[in-house]
Amino acid sequence: MSTHYIAGQWRPGQGAPLQSLDPVSQAVVWQGQGASAAQVDEAVNAARGAFSLWAAHSLDGRIAVLERFAAALKSHADELARAIGEETGKPLWEAATEVTSMVNKVAISIQSYRERTGEKSGPLADATAVLRHKPHGVVAVFGPYNFPGHLPNGHIVPALLAGNCVLFKPSELTPKVAELTVKCWIEAGLPAGVLNLLQGGRETGVALAGHPGIDGLFFTGSSRTGNLLHAQFAGRPDKILALEMGGNNPLIVDQVADIDAAVYTIVQSAFISAGQRCTCARRLLVPQGQWGDALLARLVQVAGQLKVGRFDEQPAPFMGSVISLQAAAQLMQAQADLLAKGATALLAMTQPQADAALLTPGILDVTAVSERPDEEFFGPLLQVIRYSDFDGAIAEANTTAFGLAAGLLSDSKARYEQFWLHSRAGIVNWNKQLTGAASTAPFGGIGASGNHRASAYYAADYCAYPVASLESEALTLPTTLTPGVTL
């Protein structure tokens, strides 16, 4: 099978065998072989060879290619959505929204480039001060499995717009989505070598991340891998590194008037995408007492009735599967570990079929657990912590090395202002689901959640570097010379 796209040609892989599976049926969706180190080298050289012409291409010319890419995505939307559903397990309705986000990223990136990294000038004494931006050169993009189209697209589109050439290494769990996306770029007329696709697992990733021919790496994925990349790039100020690594996100519930509105927002925050969004709520902070008890009882009732099913099931499920049987097993083990440490199951997460990666929502009260792990349990497992006062709830919310998202459900603006002031997160929401974000806002966090603001409006900032110039069309002698100089 032709697995990789290098220098404008589809090539079979020379590395380890690779296949993606439908996480529910375990049917093979895609198969091939990963890229070898030699093929990584070939792809880097192809990108390096294409860079000068692509960077010299006019901005309008690059925009035209991007807009044709958006048109290709629209024309293949159903095929892409089905591939996303097949490989990730997310319901078709949700997969379709991901394709829409991919399309919209083009216009957003163009607007962002013009506003944040376009050309600006102004008079300065007898010269003109000009700010322009240049592409870094050849950059690697490592994509995640949870949004295999949208999230790598959020790096690739602004990188190409800025004039970079790209080496795209998708998750080894979602190669089909990556292949279809690259075919849309080909349909758009992207020149050979400007975008190269390298499928593969660890072997391919290590070879690409360590290649001396790349000028930077843009990564969305696990904290573990992101930390390894950060250590690898330490001491290399000549290379740009952008990381988005998820979080252990808190959602505080104040005593609100509308319990059902709170429950619905919690469900959307914790269990959308089967809990496989980096901004999903992992910790729910609920006040002690009768009102908090009533909220949790209603939450357990609603969460226990959520429809879970295969991606193309009709009527459509709210939740699909997690990405793999291995991921399901790890989540079930995480629940068992928390229960062994003293947690109480308000709603036990279950795996109805041993041979399918479908999990039902889990809600555990971990208030009594003295040493709660500061980990991102990437699935439908929500931890509840009861609090006695609002100051204590904010302090508890901040007890994490991560800092991606935090939220508050409250009828009090004063409490939200207090929460916003003291929250340690890059995304802070009030009375909105934690997974919600504006496309024109930066996306990312602080601490162990990463650096820069990956794959969103501020992606333009790390896809090009600023060049400041003082310019004058004529070389003239100043009327007053510097003291000590005689001409």
Curated annotation (Swiss-Prot):
Family of this protein: Belongs to the aldehyde dehydrogenase family. AstD subfamily.
Function: Catalyzes the NAD-dependent reduction of succinylglutamate semialdehyde into succinylglutamate.
Protein's gene: astD
Chain sites annotated for binding NAD(+): 221-226
Xref: NCBIfam families: arg_catab_astD, PRK09457.1
EC number(s) on file: 1.2.1.71
PROSITE patterns hit by this protein: ALDEHYDE_DEHYDR_CYS (PS00070), ALDEHYDE_DEHYDR_GLU (PS00687)
Annotated active site: 244, 278
Source organism: Ectopseudomonas mendocina (strain ymp) (Pseudomonas mendocina)
Protein name as it appears in the record: N-succinylglutamate 5-semialdehyde dehydrogenase
The protein's annotated pathway: Amino-acid degradation; L-arginine degradation via AST pathway; L-glutamate and succinate from L-arginine: step 4/5
HAMAP family for the chain: Aldedh_AstD
Biological process according to GO: arginine catabolic process to glutamate; arginine catabolic process to succinate
Annotated keywords: Arginine metabolism, NAD, Oxidoreductase
Enzyme class: oxidoreductase
